[in-house]
């Protein structure tokens, strides 16, 4: 494509603060591009002083002088660049930010997208690595790109689309790198366009901006010769182009527009550069450990310690790999396998993986919350032993929302013994809402009921099936227990082709029961709990006297009542109390962490206030001396 003429005109700088559809499809307020460019020329292109994401928001800026609003003009809301950074801190995990960008591409399947590519390139200007996301979806027209790069705008209201808040692009790109440039082509109403926009934290910081602005250019490519889409004046276009070339990875207009050559007639390419470093001064993302993958650095691998073989075996499982391998994480990120869509990482397609396909002794349990009234609230919970059990003590539930993995290997039971080892479940819970970073769920009453139900399912499945892996059928000694016995009845379930027990998996220490009568099965587990604030160093009160329930059938089981309650009712009540106790302990720990976090934030704010007070005093002295 020939370069654009130098006297062409394109859009003004757009402010990143609006969700309006007004102003002829151009979102947000505008400021003179030449004014912004004037500020841009004051500083040479360079990276931020602090390249660590978690420290990049700690700086003080002397605000620019705000130009008075002209008569008849509406004042637009101003968004400070520090808000852009703080908004991205919702992503504690870098792969969570990458998943947000993958969600955007997956949502484009309805517009014809067949792939999304994730790769690494080297920036010619300084030979630094950059992250590239590219899809062949419908692309974005000029108005669409402005909505994408504006705060809080979301037009995704479908029951199948994943995005919902309208902040995913901004928070995700900022979490991965300081700067991002977007190239997009689309066709709307017979008009084909291509647009370029840059969201640069480096530019905003280095030029002392106190308002987030996004330089953009738009081109009409419907005709034989590309024509600029004019919103302002030739001077504004020249200033916009100057900003793009100065703060993007591309030094000339030709290099900039060449990025469209592999986009095709429609699609989007996002380049994230000035990637963040960790505390040791090396890139947070690793591109060299595996040329077919993008990895997070696992500090425990290089600590020089020799690990036990069981720990090494545990780290070989995907439940551990997905924390550090993007390929492993992407393979499980979506529950249903795509038919005509591929996720391609560094040139190689990702093979989708559903851990439920390899379950041993799988079962399906239908679940619907009592308060649910819609069909969307019911779900099927697939549960079974992982194929590596009992060798690996993997456990937990992979919980999806609208086909997207939110909580991988969520452990709902407390550790301390072998109960639940090897038991893994998979479910799609569309009746609860994910958190903003899509790495957890909102703590609603529906979520709490689901958690309690999953605990019961794990216990029931374990007691009904643990002997199939060679574990002893649990029998609590009559003369030895200072713990609470937790019996449970297995829920109504449908068994899916249970496999015979391999002879090499049978324990030699006890009898193996090959047939299970689920209707008559009884089981028990011993767990001790004390009030959290009365525990000593061993975890129990010194005067704590646990209760023991005999797991063997008694006369009460056949109809005799104790204080009006049968033994079965007492056992059920005991189970409920046990699960409530677990929940309270978990809430107590979460509350303690929250208090510590708030205390830390309070100290930080006190320090900043003291610093600001010193600056104010110094300013007053300067004014008095003047």
UniProtKB/Swiss-Prot annotation:
The keyword DNA damage applies. GO terms for biological process: chromatin organization; defense response to virus; DNA repair; plant-type hypersensitive response; positive regulation of defense response to bacterium; positive regulation of systemic acquired resistance; regulation of DNA repair; regulatory ncRNA-mediated gene silencing. Residues 579-626 form a coiled coil. Its main location: nucleus. The gene is MORC2. Disruption phenotype: In the double mutant crt1-2 crh1-1, compromised resistance to avirulent Pseudomonas syringae and Hyaloperonospora arabidopsidis associated with compromised cytosolic calcium accumulation upon infection. The double mutant crt1-2 crh1-1 also exhibits an increased sensitivity to turnip crinkle virus (TCV), and reduced defense response mediated by flg22 against Pseudomonas syringae (Pst). Impaired non-host resistance toward Phytophthora infestans and altered systemic acquired resistance (SAR) triggered by P.syringae pv. maculicola (Psm) AvrRpt2 cor(-). Transmembrane segments: none annotated. Keywords: ATP-binding, Chromatin regulator, Coiled coil, DNA damage, DNA repair, DNA-binding, Endonuclease, Endosome, Hydrolase, Hypersensitive response, Kinase, Nuclease, Nucleotide-binding, Nucleus, Plant defense, RNA-binding, RNA-mediated gene silencing, Transferase. It comes from Arabidopsis thaliana (Mouse-ear cress). Its EC number is 3.6.-.-. Its cofactor is Mg(2+); Mn(2+). It is an enzyme of class 3 (hydrolase). Belongs to the MORC ATPase protein family. The lineage of its organism: Eukaryota, Viridiplantae, Streptophyta, Embryophyta, Tracheophyta. Mediator of defense signaling triggered by distinct classes of R proteins. Required during hypersensitive response (HR) that confers disease resistance to turnip crinkle virus (TCV). Contributes to resistance against Pseudomonas syringae and Hyaloperonospora arabidopsidis, at early stages prior to cytosolic calcium ions Ca(2+) accumulation. Required for pathogen-associated molecular pattern (PAMP)-triggered immunity, basal resistance, non-host resistance and systemic acquired resistance (SAR). This is Protein MICRORCHIDIA 2. Pfam families: HATPase_c_3, Morc6_S5. One of its GO terms (cellular component) is endosome. It is found in: Nucleus; Endosome. It comes from the Eukaryota. One of its GO terms (molecular function) is ATP binding.
């Amino acid at each position: 494509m020939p370069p654009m003429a130098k006297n062409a005109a394109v859009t003004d700088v757009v402010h990143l603060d609006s969700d309006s559809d007004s102003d002829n499809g151009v979102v947000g307020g505008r400021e003179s591009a030449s004014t912004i460019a004037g500020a841009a020329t004051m500083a040479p292109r360079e990276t931020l002083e602090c390249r660590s994401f978690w420290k990049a928001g700690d700086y003080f800026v002397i605000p620019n002088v705000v130009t008075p609003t002209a008569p008849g003009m509406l004042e637009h809301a101003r968004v400070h660049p520090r808000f852009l950074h703080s908004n991205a801190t919702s992503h504690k995990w870098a792969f969570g930010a990458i998943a947000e960008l993958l969600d955007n591409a997956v949502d484009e399947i309805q517009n014809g997208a067949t792939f999304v590519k994730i790769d690494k390139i080297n920036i010619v200007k300084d030979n630094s690595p950059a992250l590239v996301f590219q899809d062949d979806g419908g692309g974005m027209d000029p108005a669409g790109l402005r909505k994408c790069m504006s705060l809080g705008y979301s037009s995704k209201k479908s029951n199948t689309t994943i995005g919902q808040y309208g902040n995913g692009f901004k928070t995700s790109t900022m979490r991965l790198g300081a700067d991002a440039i977007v190239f997009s082509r689309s066709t709307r109403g017979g008009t084909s366009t291509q647009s370029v926009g840059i969201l640069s934290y480096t530019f905003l910081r280095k030029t002392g901006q106190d308002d987030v602005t996004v330089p953009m250019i738009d081109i009409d490519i419907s005709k034989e010769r590309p024509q600029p889409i004019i919103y302002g004046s030739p001077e504004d276009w020249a200033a916009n182009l100057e900003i793009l070339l100065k703060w993007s990875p591309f030094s000339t207009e030709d290099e900039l527009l060449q990025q469209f050559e592999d986009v095709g007639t429609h699609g989007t390419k996002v380049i994230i550069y000035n990637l963040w470093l960790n505390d040791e001064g090396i890139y947070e993302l690793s591109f060299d450990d595996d040329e077919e993958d993008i990895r997070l650095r696992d500090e425990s691998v290089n600590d020089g310690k020799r690990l036990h073989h069981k720990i090494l075996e545990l780290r070989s499982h995907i439940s551990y790999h997905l924390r550090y391998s993007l390929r492993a994480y992407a393979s499980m990120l979506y529950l249903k396998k795509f038919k005509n869509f591929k996720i391609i990482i560094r040139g190689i397609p990702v093979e989708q993986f559903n851990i439920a396909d390899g379950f041993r002794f799988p079962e399906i349990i239908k679940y619907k919350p009592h308060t649910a009234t819609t069909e969307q609230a019911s779900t099927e919970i697939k549960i079974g032993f992982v194929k590596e059990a009992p060798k690996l003590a993997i456990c937990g539930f992979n919980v999806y929302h609208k086909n997207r993995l939110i909580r991988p290997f969520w452990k709902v039971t407390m550790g301390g013994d072998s109960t639940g080892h090897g038991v893994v479940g998979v479910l799609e819970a569309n009746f609860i809402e994910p958190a903003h970073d899509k790495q957890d769920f909102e703590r609603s009453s529906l979520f709490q009921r689901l958690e309690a139900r999953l605990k019961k399912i794990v216990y029931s499945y374990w007691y009904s099936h643990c002997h199939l892996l060679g574990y002893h059928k649990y029998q609590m000694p009559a003369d030895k227990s200072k713990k609470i016995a937790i019996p449970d009845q297995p829920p109504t379930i449908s068994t899916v082709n249970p496999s015979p027990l391999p002879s090499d998996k049978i324990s030699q220490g006890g009898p193996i029961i090959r047939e299970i009568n689920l209707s008559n099965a009884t089981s028990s587990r011993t767990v001790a709990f004390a009030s959290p604030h009365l525990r000593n160093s061993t975890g129990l009160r010194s005067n704590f006297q646990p209760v023991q329930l005999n797991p063997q059938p008694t006369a009460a089981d056949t109809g005799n009542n104790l204080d009006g309650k049968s033994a079965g009712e007492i056992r059920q009540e005991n189970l409920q109390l046990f699960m409530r106790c677990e929940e309270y302990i978990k809430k107590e720990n979460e509350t303690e962490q929250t208090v510590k976090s708030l205390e830390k934030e309070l100290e930080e704010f006190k320090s900043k206030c003291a610093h600001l007070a010193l600056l104010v005093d110094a300013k007053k002295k300067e004014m008095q001396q003047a």
